């Protein structure tokens, strides 16, 4: 049989060598093999239509077998190697939604689970199989319990409990081999039947993991692997819909029975967005190893790396779109690894490379809404600084809990970070195991999410457009009317507590101009720091400078105070940066505030 190298095949098919290498990895050439680092491809495996034949993208696919056999699959199987190298008793992976958690957990299930099917066929062409017998000897050797709570999104505790109970029952039914087991006692089979037929109480359900692991251990003679995917989805629902204590109490007992001091457990895996250690769900569980977005371990296995995105673009013949895909969907950093949002990347390529905010429609953005609704003036100003492309430095607590959103101002940034709305630009480890971090908005997609939530939550959209029209037309009376009308409808008498509040409010109202201006806040220019500057992105529109004054004194004249703000712009030469940038027309605006005036 004659073999060709990648360069020869690329020339014959009229595609790049890199694309041929990618097709080899994907198994598109039957019989292709790697020899001394070079792919050798059977000549009879090459046909002209191969250059056009491409696997579909796995949009909405979380089934590992289906993904690897019928779709373009990004190989994440070395996660198995890294786990087996250290083998903690229970591993918790915390990542944002739609970053591949469920797919990876199903991969672990297929790898470890002992079944009648030879499931090694799904791994023989993957990277894990090249790592040697130390790793492959674990394939297909364990009974596995697998539960995913990703769809437990109910509005009441009663509905939530019912759905969890059904999921537990279905997992018992999946292990139908226990029904005819020769090693189980009559009583144990009766217990199995009660769960499989969904005839259990809430207390029974809390013992479900412990019981099923006992039965499987006894039947197979091997300890169990327990996998719980998206364990905190029902906890978030509990916070949003006022059954938080009920779900936390249930989960505490449920996990304690299955994962703490369970002699029938080989090892366990959990995924979620939050660690929630403070909630005592994992109280006293000293066998738990948490892997957060700040940790270096496993950093490349959730989401796509730069190289994986380049390979994918190459496979689909879209190499020229790399910079655009970086601008829109890159920017995350897990540990020290640069990561792209995988859901958005595959949707972008499938949607003919038209960029838009794919991720925002995949789940609730209520966290942002709640943060905005309860934000202090300082928090509001910081959120708008982030929206304008600035970084802020803040304490990050990776074990943040949902009720702290309103009570702990530092928790806001921790929530936004672990949920995928912020990226880490730099980390400064603290003695308590947490971090001080420089954080920023990761990419254009998330800017759209912020803008949508900020404007919608405060009902600003139409008002913002009108206010900006008044600014552009230099209509001071209309601007005053619109601002007062907005404040009357949108803020309480307690909100206007300091100048920082009004500063943040104005930043938010200017956010709609982000596609025409670089919006800057509290930056040095001339002899001091301006409040807000709008640096035009085109030469044919004016630049803007805003200076704000605030008073509580009802006797003080607001017009005189606004004049002082305007004079400060000139005295401090705040227009220096705009003039140095070649901006010819500069509009200076001084505004004074008192309460809702």
Give the ranges of each region predicted by the language model.
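Short, charged/polar, Gly/Pro-enriched secondary-structure boundary elements
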Residues: 45-52, 445-449, 540-542
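The DNA-recognition helices of helix-turn-helix-type DNA-binding domains
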Residues: 27-28, 111
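Short beta-strand
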Residues: 31-34, 426, 519-524
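Residue-level detection of the helix-turn-helix DNA-binding "recognition helix"
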Residues: 21-26
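Structural signature of nuclease core domains in nucleic-acid processing machines
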Residues: 476-597
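Polyanion-binding surface elements
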Residues: 1-19
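Short helix-start
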Residues: 6-7, 29-52
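Phosphate-binding site recognition
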Residues: 54-500, 512-517
């Amino acid at each position: 049989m004659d073999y060709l190298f990648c360069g020869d095949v690329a020339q014959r098919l009229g595609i790049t060598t890199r694309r041929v290498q990618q097709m080899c990895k994907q198994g598109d050439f039957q019989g292709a093999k790697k020899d001394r680092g070079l792919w050798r491809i059977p000549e009879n495996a090459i046909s002209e239509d191969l250059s056009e034949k491409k696997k579909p993208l796995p949009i909405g696919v979380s089934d590992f077998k289906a993904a690897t056999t019928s779709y373009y699959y990004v190989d994440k199987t070395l996660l198995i190697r890294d786990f087996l190298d250290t083998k903690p008793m229970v591993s918790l992976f915390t990542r944002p939604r739609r970053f591949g958690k469920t797919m990876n957990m199903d991969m672990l299930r297929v790898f470890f689970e002992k079944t009648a099917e030879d499931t090694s066929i799904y791994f023989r062409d993957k990277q894990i199989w090249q790592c040697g017998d130390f790793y492959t000897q674990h394939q297909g050797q364990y009974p596995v319990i697998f539960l995913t709570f990703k769809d437990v999104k109910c509005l009441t505790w009663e509905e939530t409990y019912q759905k969890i109970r059904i999921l537990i029952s279905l997992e018992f039914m999946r292990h139908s081999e226990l029904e005819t087991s020769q090693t189980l006692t009559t009583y144990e089979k009766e217990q199995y039947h009660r769960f499989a037929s969904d005839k259990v109480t809430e207390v029974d359900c809390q013992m479900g993991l412990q019981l099923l692991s006992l039965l499987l251990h006894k039947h197979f003679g091997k300890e169990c692997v327990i996998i719980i995917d998206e364990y905190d989805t029902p906890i978030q629902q509990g916070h949003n819909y006022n059954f938080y204590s009920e779900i936390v109490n249930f989960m505490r007992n449920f996990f304690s029975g299955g994962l703490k001091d369970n002699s029938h457990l080989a090892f366990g895996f959990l995924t979620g967005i939050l660690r929630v250690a403070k909630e005592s769900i994992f109280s006293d569980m000293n066998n738990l190893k948490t892997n957060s977005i700040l940790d270096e371990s496993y950093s490349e296995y959730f989401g796509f790396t730069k190289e994986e995105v380049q390979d994918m673009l190459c496979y689909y013949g879209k190499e020229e779109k790399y910079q655009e895909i970086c601008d829109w969907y890159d920017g995350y950093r897990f540990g020290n690894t640069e990561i792209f949002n995988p859901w958005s990347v595959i949707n972008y390529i499938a949607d003919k490379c038209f960029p838009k905010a794919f991720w925002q429609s995949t789940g609730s953005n209520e966290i942002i809404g709640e943060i905005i609704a309860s934000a202090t003036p300082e928090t509001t100003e910081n959120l708008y600084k982030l929206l304008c492309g600035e970084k802020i430095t803040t304490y990050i607590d990776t074990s943040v809990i949902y009720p702290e959103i309103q009570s702990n101002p530092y928790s806001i940034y921790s929530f936004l970070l672990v949920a995928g709305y912020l990226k880490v630009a730099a980390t400064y480890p603290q003695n308590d195991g947490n971090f001080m971090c420089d954080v920023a908005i990761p990419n254009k997609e998330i800017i759209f999410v912020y803008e949508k939530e900020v404007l919608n939550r405060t009902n600003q959209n139409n008002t913002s457009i009108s206010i900006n029209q008044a600014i552009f037309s230099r209509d001071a009376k209309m601007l005053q009317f619109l601002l007062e009308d907005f404040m009357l409808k949108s803020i309480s008498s307690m909100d206007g507590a300091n100048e920082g509040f009004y500063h943040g409010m104005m930043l938010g109202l200017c956010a709609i101009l982000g596609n025409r201006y670089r919006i800057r806040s509290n930056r040095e220019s001339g002899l001091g720091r301006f409040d807000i500057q709008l640096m035009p992105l085109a030469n044919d529109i004016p630049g803007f400078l805003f200076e704000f004054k605030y008073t509580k004194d009802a006797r003080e004249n607001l017009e005189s105070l606004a004049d002082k703000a305007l004079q400060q712009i000139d005295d401090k030469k705040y227009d220096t940066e705009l003039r140095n940038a070649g901006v010819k027309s500069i509009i200076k605006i001084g505004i004074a505030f008192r309460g809702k005036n």
